[in-house]
């Protein structure tokens, strides 16, 4: 008899293997699957495993030239999603040999490359990935990580403060540098290029880099603190991006920035390697993430994009505020904040963490809280994010009625007051407003900020629920 039989057969015969014991070297994925009406969940889960590994839509004779059992993805468990009709979590195990070492690009091309357009599925979302130790070890990861950054900046025991320079588009380089200087002089640790500031006609990158470097050095000399500005090196080509990073290094500034989703993982990993080799910190902005992660039943959850960034490399990444103008539910946000910072994270479904993740000492990433936050949020932010974070107030600094430097002073005073109160054992969640009010008695800048923003709230329900 001939070993090869042409024709189309059910995926579940080959790719649904509930008896499979996962290996320590497997990459594990949890997908939220919404099958088309009439498609059984086992078939849908198996289809995902097949299409994201070795399968194709029909039997091919070349299957006989390899060992499918060694290379195929396997759907090893399926569970219904509580409270949702015809939605399932499908767990898929991928053998390590399917992936190129040290390439987030290849990992994503395999796992989420083709399968999301699959007709048998109404919707598909990648909820979480377990990256095995053996694969983690093929990545450099963040250029420096949390501890090295603190040592470089000589700042300990508190969150770091930042500010995005606004208006984000239209300032000349000289005026932009002036705004940077005012913020840093007032007491911020960092200022930031907006994610869409690259090199436009009103402000070319080289001019901006130069004036920002001048602002940094002037502010450092006046305050005796180390300062930084996230110089956005994102560009249309990798060569141009590297040219900008090299110029930043020549200026002697401490940190550059990249938009990792629009710039792409290949560019990001290249830049991260350069940053480690040349002592630059790397700030990562997640522009475009909501296109991918905001829909509850289709796309990729941000915790996966956050894990991917830790592998590709970045020292800071924007990760929601829980309290400001942008999306973020508290437990889920803290779940991926832990995935960014900690070395070992236990599985915890209540926070959306589907797998235990061991990073085997890959450096951690500082989460950046940014978007619609101001001094009244400071106690909550200090309590939620703790010391290892960057709190970024754009409008919450520049919108101060007396200008940028007083806005920066207000934020720094509020932060120091919250850290001191916490260290004295006070409850920031309960006494937060009182702590800010007390501090504003001896800081007119803070008092003015408190007055301006006392009524501002962004109250909408979070979409990112379990």
UniProtKB/Swiss-Prot annotation:
Cofactor note: Binds 1 Mg(2+) ion per subunit.
Post-translational modification summary for this protein: The disulfide bond which can form in the large chain dimeric partners within the hexadecamer appears to be associated with oxidative stress and protein turnover.
Cellular component terms per the entry's GO annotation: chloroplast
Needed co-factor(s): Mg(2+)
Assigned keywords, A-Z: Calvin cycle, Carbon dioxide fixation, Chloroplast, Disulfide bond, Lyase, Magnesium, Metal-binding, Methylation, Monooxygenase, Oxidoreductase, Photorespiration, Photosynthesis, Plastid
Record site feature (Transition state stabilizer), residues: 325
Residues recorded with modification N6-carboxylysine: 192
Entry's EC annotation: 4.1.1.39
Compartment(s): Plastid, Chloroplast
The keyword Plastid is assigned to this record: yes
Keyword Transmembrane: no
Annotated binding of substrate, by residue: 114, 164, 168, 286, 318, 370
Active site: 166, 285
UniProt cross-references to Gene3D superfamilies, sorted A to Z: Ribulose bisphosphate carboxylase, large subunit, C-terminal domain (3.20.20.110), RuBisCO large subunit, N-terminal domain (3.30.70.150)
Positions contributing to Mg(2+) binding: 192, 194-195
Name of the top EC class for this enzyme: lyase
Molecular function as annotated in GO: magnesium ion binding; monooxygenase activity; ribulose-bisphosphate carboxylase activity
Catalytic activity field: 2 (2R)-3-phosphoglycerate + 2 H(+) = D-ribulose 1,5-bisphosphate + CO2 + H2O; D-ribulose 1,5-bisphosphate + O2 = 2-phosphoglycolate + (2R)-3-phosphoglycerate + 2 H(+)
Main location: plastid
GO biological process, one term: reductive pentose-phosphate cycle
Note: The basic functional RuBisCO is composed of a large chain homodimer in a 'head-to-tail' conformation. In form I RuBisCO this homodimer is arranged in a barrel-like tetramer with the small subunits forming a tetrameric 'cap' on each end of the 'barrel'.
Family assignment from sequence similarity: Belongs to the RuBisCO large chain family. Type I subfamily.
Function: RuBisCO catalyzes two reactions: the carboxylation of D-ribulose 1,5-bisphosphate, the primary event in carbon dioxide fixation, as well as the oxidative fragmentation of the pentose substrate in the photorespiration process. Both reactions occur simultaneously and in competition at the same active site.
Subunit record text: Heterohexadecamer of 8 large chains and 8 small chains; disulfide-linked. The disulfide link is formed within the large subunit homodimers.
Protein name: Ribulose bisphosphate carboxylase large chain
Organism: Berzelia lanuginosa (Buttonbush)
């Amino acid at each position: 008899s001939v070993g090869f039989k042409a024709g189309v057969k059910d995926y579940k015969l080959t790719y649904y293997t509930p008896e499979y014991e996962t290996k320590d070297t497997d990459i594990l994925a949890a997908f939220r699957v919404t099958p088309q009406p009439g498609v059984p969940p086992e078939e849908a889960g198996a289809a995902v495993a097949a299409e994201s590994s070795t399968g194709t839509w029909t039997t091919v004779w070349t299957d006989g030239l390899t060992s499918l059992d060694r290379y195929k993805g396997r759907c090893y468990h399926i569970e219904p999603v509580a409270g949702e009709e015809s939605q399932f979590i499908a767990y898929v195990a991928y053998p390590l040999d399917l992936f190129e070492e040290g390439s987030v690009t290849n990992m994503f091309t395999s796992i989420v490359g083709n399968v999301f357009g699959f007709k048998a599925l109404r919707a598909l979302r990648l909820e979480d990935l377990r990256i095995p130790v053996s694969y983690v070890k093929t990545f450099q990861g963040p250029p420096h990580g949390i501890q090295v950054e603190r040592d470089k900046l000589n700042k300990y025991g508190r969150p770091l403060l930042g500010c995005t320079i606004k208006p984000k588009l239209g300032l000349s380089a000289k005026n932009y540098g002036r705004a940077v200087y005012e913020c840093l002089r007032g007491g911020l640790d960092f200022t930031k290029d907006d994610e869409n500031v690259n090199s436009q006609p009103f402000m070319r990158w080289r001019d901006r880099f130069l004036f920002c470097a001048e602002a940094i050095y002037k502010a450092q000399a006046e305050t005796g603190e180390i300062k930084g500005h996230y110089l956005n090196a994102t560009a249309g080509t990798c060569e141009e991006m590297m040219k900008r990073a090299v110029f930043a290094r020549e200026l002697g500034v401490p940190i550059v920035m990249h938009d990792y989703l629009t710039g792409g993982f290949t560019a990001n990993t290249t830049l991260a390697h350069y940053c480690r080799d040349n002592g630059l910190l790397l700030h990562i902005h997640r522009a475009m993430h909501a296109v991918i992660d905001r829909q509850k039943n289709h796309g990729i959850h941000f915790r996966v994009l956050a894990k991917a960034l830790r592998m590709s490399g970045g020292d800071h990444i924007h990760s929601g505020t829980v309290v400001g103008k942008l999306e973020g539910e508290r437990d889920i946000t803290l779940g991926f904040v832990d995935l960014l910072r900690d070395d070992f994270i236990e599985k915890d479904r209540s926070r959306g963490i589907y797998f235990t993740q061991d990073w085997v000492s890959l450096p951690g990433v500082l989460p950046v809280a940014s978007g619609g936050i101001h001094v009244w949020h400071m106690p909550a932010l200090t309590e939620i994010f703790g010391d290892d974070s960057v709190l970024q107030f754009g409008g919450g600094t520049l919108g101060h009625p007396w200008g940028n430097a007083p806005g920066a002073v207000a934020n720094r005073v509020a932060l120091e007051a919250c850290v001191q109160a916490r260290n004295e054992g006070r409850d920031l969640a309960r006494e937060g407003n009182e702590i800010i009010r007390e501090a504003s008695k001896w800081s007119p800048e803070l008092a003015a900020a408190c007055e301006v923003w006392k009524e501002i709230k962004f109250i909408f329900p979070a979409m990112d629920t379990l």
